[in-house]
Amino acid sequence: MDFDTITSISTPMGEGAIGIVRLSGPQAVEIGDKLYKGKKKLEDVDSHTINYGHIVDPETNEVVEEVMISVLRAPRTFTREDIIEINCHGGILTINRILELTMTHGARMAEPGEYTKRAFLNGRIDLSQAEAVMDFIRSKTDRASKVAMNQIEGRLSDLIKRQRQSILEILAQVEVNIDYPEYDDVEDATTEFLLEQSKKIKNEINLLLETGAQGKIMREGLSTVIVGKPNVGKSSMLNNLIQDNKAIVTEVAGTTRDVLEEYVNVRGVPLRLVDTAGIRDTEDIVEKIGVERSRKALSEADLILFVLNNNEPLTQEDRTLYEVIKNEDAIVIVNKTDLEQNLDINEVKEMIGDTPLIQTSMLKQEGIDQLELQIRDLFFGGDVQNQDMTYVSNSRHISLLKQARNAIQDAIDAAESGIPMDMVQIDLTRTWELLGEIIGESASDELIDQLFSQFCLGK
């Protein structure tokens, strides 16, 4: 597939030690040679080398910058095209000047995600691997980055390709049955083979889907909302979990007037912690906005940490808050155990039933370990599975796998009911196509464009 040559800045904008301008395409080396002055022309250097020299404006012969240029020749590159990377000092003015020179002499500004898109279109990676590149960039924990790296390396792709190959083998048998309907033994053998292989594929899809909940948590983080009356210690809890002081902690009720969010790795579980404004009736306009945002965060939460004050009796406000969350995955935390106990624990247990309860003192940092273990146990049964497993974490992949499972179940039901093989063939083909959408072998151009448009510029 023929493309033009693209260019972009591949490092974050701003002052830094190093800035990189990347070019990819058939004229990458030629454009580089128009700007580069060194011991050798770039066209004469070996592939996968880095070369010292200067960028010079060809129009004025002005030395723009001292650089190191990497030369990477196709096909042993990420895009499977010629690539050069111009490494310069990280000043905004200089790196923009070099970018402008590359465009003046034949390159086009790359679109977001275009390098990865070219890697996909040139067969370097499939669509699920391309999506994993962005997951890796966005990962918030070591575990999430490991899951993404496994997918970049092709673990999910290999599984999907094997399943599609198995379906093709079933379809080949079905074709024999359709072509030679007069042979009963062929029909019997085909039906037996179809059912055996289809059930095996369905079981494999089910195993992948079983990793979906954990995979999605690792990819996106477990959305965890801390809720309770004002001044029960919600922000102190957030600070203890993230070991930071982002939330404002004071003795004034209603201090947290917005939703504060932070990522933290708790016992291998990535949490997206959300500290909310206390939910209560208020006339303060600013606080009222915070309360509404808190209600929205609650409705979207995977886990709710409901905080009570050990120093105060249970109130109607506490009961009202618990009514809002009682049907959700929640942990009740009795905080401030370092203070005099005025809270009736039996009354709390009667209200919350089987909901887990942890007692803590955020001031003395007591009970935090128990809280972390309870979070892990609630969602992972006490066992955060091996990060080397193949996880499905992408919502698009999960949706397609569910559709594929339904389609192959339709094929199984049809075969068991004695429906003609040409009808069964339709469901099998549909399963094959749905699995192909995951790795991009049967994805539409519109879907591909939409997915890559979400990437950052320069990747």
From Swiss-Prot:
Annotated binding of GTP, by residue: 231-236, 250-256, 275-278
Binding residue positions for (6S)-5-formyl-5,6,7,8-tetrahydrofolate: R22, E85, R124, K459
Protein known as: tRNA modification GTPase MnmE
EC number: 3.6.-.-
Source superkingdom: Bacteria
MF terms in GO: GTP binding; GTPase activity; metal ion binding
Gene3D superfamilies: P-loop containing nucleotide triphosphate hydrolases, Probable tRNA modification gtpase trme, domain 1, tRNA modification GTPase MnmE domain 2
Organism: Staphylococcus haemolyticus (strain JCSC1435)
Cofactor(s) of this protein: K(+)
Family from the record: Belongs to the TRAFAC class TrmE-Era-EngA-EngB-Septin-like GTPase superfamily. TrmE GTPase family.
Keywords linked to the UniProt accession: Cytoplasm, GTP-binding, Hydrolase, Magnesium, Metal-binding, Nucleotide-binding, Potassium, tRNA processing
Enzyme superclass (EC): hydrolase
UniProt xrefs under Pfam families: MMR_HSR1, MnmE_helical, TrmE_N
Location of the TrmE-type G domain: 221-380
Annotated function: Exhibits a very high intrinsic GTPase hydrolysis rate. Involved in the addition of a carboxymethylaminomethyl (cmnm) group at the wobble position (U34) of certain tRNAs, forming tRNA-cmnm(5)s(2)U34.
Compartmental location: Cytoplasm
